[in-house]
Amino acid sequence: MNSFLEYTICNRGTNAYSPKAGYHHLDQAFPGPFHTGHASDSYNADGRLYVGGSNQPPTAAAQHQHQNGIYAHHQHQNQTGMGLTYGGTGTTSYGTQACANSDYAQHQYFINPEQDGMYYHSSGFSTSNASPHYGSMAGAYCGAQGAVPAAPYQHHGCEGQDHQRAYSQGTYADLSASQGTEKDTDQPPPGKTFDWMKVKRNPPKTGKVAEYGLGPQNTIRTNFTTKQLTELEKEFHFSKYLTRARRVEIAATLELNETQVKIWFQNRRMKQKKREKEGLAPASSTSSKDLEDQSDHSTSTSPEASPSPDS
């Protein structure tokens, strides 16, 4: 890559060519061999620029043509590489040089201000060591004013800008896509389950049976005594449904809680319905008969009315 630094300036005469890559057909606008009689600059064997008069030795012309051939070869190699980037940190732009043909001057385009060492150069001559010397050799790049018409170069400058704009847009799109993928990798997947999600939020209670029967599901079955069962059967014989006041009274008498009395009456009603459905027990006739017998017994035991004096 160091060979590009030795061929930065090729000609200053009328047959100067565009330093932009890919525009070798510009020589068609200026046909003819290389002019050595009117050129004021020449090359020696080591490729350095010497400013002299019109009396140029024939060996310099041969060396000049040889250097041009080598430059064309290197220029072709530069075209085959796709988007070569050079790590130079020079910030001098060729477009700021004071010359008549501004489109003829070389340009460098920065892709991203955050990336210090990456920028796109139209002609491939980008290095930090050579950037301070471009200000003093502005005339060598631009050429003499009026020597080369600016019309053929304006069209190519537009093409270079369009190509550079498309290249910059593609680079920005790639950078934004890569940044988007990095952000996506940092975020956890939405369907991931954590350990704290697997823990049961409402574990079963392990305390004692609370009052009113609000206990755990594995509540121990209540074992009623014979006295408690007898009193509950008597109460069920008189009334299948209890009021709240009567339920509290029976629970206090039998040393039970209100919920236990309520559940016993519910189970007893379900058993009674099952018996009536199977036909083992009369439906409600027995209960009605019992009520009638009790009413008759109460009336018979009541004292008779005293006879009237008229009878």
From Swiss-Prot:
DNA-binding region range list: 217-276
Keyword Cell cycle tagged: no
Pfam families cross-referenced by the UniProt entry: Homeodomain
MF terms in GO: DNA-binding transcription factor activity, RNA polymerase II-specific; RNA polymerase II cis-regulatory region sequence-specific DNA binding; sequence-specific DNA binding
Compositional bias ranges of the Low complexity kind: 298-311
InterPro entries: HD, HD_metazoa, Homeobox_CS, Homeodomain-like_sf, HXA1/B1/D1
Region (Disordered): 267-311
GO annotation, cellular component aspect: nucleus
PANTHER family: HOMEOBOX PROTEIN HOX-B1, HOMEOBOX PROTEIN ROUGH-RELATED
Function (record text): Sequence-specific transcription factor which is part of a developmental regulatory system that provides cells with specific positional identities on the anterior-posterior axis.
Family assignment from sequence similarity: Belongs to the Antp homeobox family. Labial subfamily.
Protein name in UniProt: Homeobox protein Hox-B1a
